[in-house]
């Protein structure tokens, strides 16, 4: 798997970099409420230990460290959810389609990626297995009011990033 693909994934949701775009998405059918983590989120300047997280993945800091404006959109459509991530300054946008508690598998550059979203105590969690890198990445999305705190973990390294509710599309 390319370093660029891994880095783009880490800037938002690791899973999103490997998911396929939503087929036939209809904004009129999108549900934006019902779970605290659903909605539109925009990254703030608050970030902790992200460079250490990038290093733990074996990626070069000069290329992938730092703070890039990132947007998350999480909504429900029918019996499944979408998690769309965009990083405008990297020209990146992707959408992963998932059902809670069900494993998804996809391919990226001929590499198998397995992921699973769950909900625990009202928080959204994503676990991503990247066998070719021998890595398991854990993401957790916790909401306090209009703020979402995302925790990234790989091995014994933890990083955090904060997002605010956004009205932008």
Swiss-Prot record:
Family matches, as InterPro entries: Calycin, Fatty_acid-bd
Positions of the UniProt region annotated as SAHS-c1: 31-60
Region annotation SAHS-c2: where it falls in the sequence: 75-103
Subcellular location: Secreted
Function: Secreted heat soluble protein acting as a molecular shield in water-deficient condition. Tardigrade-specific intrinsically disordered proteins (TDPs) are essential for desiccation tolerance by forming non-crystalline amorphous solids upon desiccation, and this vitrified state mirrors their protective capabilities.
Additional remarks: Trehalose, a disaccharide essential for several organisms to survive drying, is detected at low levels or not at all in some tardigrade species, indicating that tardigrades possess potentially novel mechanisms for surviving desiccation involving tardigrade-specific intrinsically disordered proteins (TDPs).
Record text about domains: SAHS-c1, SAHS-c2 and SAHS-c3 are 3 highly conserved regions within the SAHS protein family.
UniProt protein name: Secretory-abundant heat soluble protein 1
Organism annotation: Ramazzottius varieornatus
Encoding gene per record: SAHS1
């Amino acid at each position: 798997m390319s370093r660029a693909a891994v880095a783009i994934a880490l800037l938002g949701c690791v899973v999103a970099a490997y998911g396929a775009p939503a087929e036939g998405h209809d904004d009129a059918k999108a549900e934006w409420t019902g779970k605290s983590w659903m909605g539109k989120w925009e990254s703030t300047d608050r970030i902790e230990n992200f460079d250490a997280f990038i290093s733990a993945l074996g990626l070069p800091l000069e290329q992938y460290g730092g703070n890039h404006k990132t947007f998350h959109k999480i909504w429900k459509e029918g019996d499944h959810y979408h998690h769309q991530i965009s990083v405008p300054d990297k020209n990146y946008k992707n959408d992963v389609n998932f059902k809670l508690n069900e494993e998804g598998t996809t391919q990226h550059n001929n590499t198998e990626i397995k992921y699973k979203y769950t909900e625990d105590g009202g928080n959204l969690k994503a676990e991503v297995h990247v066998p070719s890198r021998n890595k398991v990445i854990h993401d957790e999305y916790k909401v306090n009011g209009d703020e979402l705190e995302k925790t990234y973990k790989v091995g014994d390294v933890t990083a955090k990033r904060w997002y605010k509710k956004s009205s932008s599309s």
